[in-house]
Swiss-Prot record:
Functional note: Odorant receptor.
Family annotation (Gene3D superfamilies): Rhodopsin 7-helix transmembrane proteins
Cytoplasmic side: 50-56, 120-143, 217-240, 293-310
Keywords: Cell membrane, Disulfide bond, G-protein coupled receptor, Glycoprotein, Membrane, Olfaction, Receptor, Sensory transduction, Transducer, Transmembrane, Transmembrane helix
Name recorded for this polypeptide: Olfactory receptor 5H14
Family: Belongs to the G-protein coupled receptor 1 family.
Transmembrane segments: 29-49, 57-77, 99-119, 144-164, 196-216, 241-261, 272-292
Species: Homo sapiens
PROSITE patterns: G_PROTEIN_RECEP_F1_1 (PS00237), G_PROTEIN_RECEP_F1_2 (PS50262)
Extracellular side: 1-28, 78-98, 165-195, 262-271
Length: 310
């Protein structure tokens, strides 16, 4: 009876970051610049790969899709944050919240699978170089890409489905700068223990599987590199894997800490700085990490601009 008489909430307040009023415009401009650079960098990388037929190979097909997912991840979070910097009210409707959570969950999960697939690609390239063209074909790459997106979609649908069993009546204040699953569950009027369990099981399983794939791949890669007698060969192998290892470390570090450490009703509020790092900063850095020392990408980028000038 109490639940029936309670007023259902359909709007929420995103608290966002705490800052002095005079910092509102500088913060808005800073995040706007970051977002624009992120979108230009990732879409630029996609354009370079799309335009150059020489880059239509598994390594760059995976990189192009990573850039697409990074652009989606950044957009799903940053656009609403930019609006809230200037808006008097930081309200978000329940439907908007679910849409944001859905797009966020798809992009985050898909990126996990993509990073694992890229690690496998590096394993085959370094440990089985002669068999690489036969094993890592474009057909296999496309199938792995489809599985990555399907995995992201299913994971998002699971959490969206379980959200429909919840009602929100008491508090409408989300202690975050976007609609993330954990802060939303914490203000649920309905018992959200099952939802927390689903987060722990599915998010945990995905992270264990993808991180495990990355670790196992690089254990074999490291073993193969150490067997190489040529210093030049070792440098080339490290150069091939360095960018991906850095990207994986930056992405999985805060992500694993947040979702494996906070998926319980008693856990403290999420550290928003950790969320900011992997939703805003990592998508900004990835195009630079993968492009600046990649001679093929730089050469293709230069060619594309020369053609445009002509």
């Amino acid at each position: 009876m109490e639940e029936e008489n309670a007023t259902l909430l359909t709007e929420f307040v995103l608290t966002g970051f705490l800052y002095q009023p005079q910092w509102k415009i500088p913060l808005f401009l800073a995040f706007l610049v970051i977002y624009l650079i992120t979108i230009m960098g990732n879409l630029g990388l996609i354009a370079v790969i799309w335009k150059d037929p020489h880059l239509h190979i598994p390594m760059y097909l995976l990189l192009g899709n990573l850039a697409f997912v990074d652009a989606l991840l950044s957009s799903s979070v940053t656009l609403k944050m930019l609006i809230n910097f200037l808006a008097k009210s930081k309200m978000i409707s329940l439907s908007e919240c679910k849409i944001q959570l859905f797009s966020f969950a798809i992009s985050v999960t898909t990126e996990c699978f993509l990073l694992a697939t890229m690690a496998y690609d590096r394993y085959v390239a370094i440990c089985k170089p002669l068999l690489y063209p036969a094993i890592m074909t474009n057909g296999l790459c496309i199938r792995l890409l489809i599985l990555s997106y399907v995995g992201g979609l299913l994971h998002a649908l699971i959490h969206e489905g379980f959200l429909f069993r919840l009602t929100f009546c008491n508090s409408n204040i989300i202690q975050h700068f976007y609609c993330d699953i954990i802060p939303l569950l914490k203000i649920s009027y309905t018992d959200s223990s099952i939802n927390f369990l689903m987060v722990f099981i599915f998010a945990g399983s995905i992270q264990v599987f993808t991180i495990g794939t990355v670790l196992i791949s690089y254990i074999f890669v490291l073993y193969t590199i150490l067997k190489k007698k040529s210093v030049k060969g070792m440098r080339k192998a490290f150069s091939t894997c360095g960018a991906h290892l850095l990207s994986v470390s930056l992405y999985y570090g805060p992500l694993a800490f947040m979702y494996m450490g906070s998926a319980s009703p008693q856990a403290d509020d999420q550290d928003m700085m950790e969320s900011l790092f992997y939703t805003v900063i990592v998508p900004l850095l990835n195009p630079m990490i993968y492009s600046l020392r990649n001679k093929q990408v730089i050469a293709s980028f230069t060619k594309m601009f020369k053609r445009n000038d002509v």
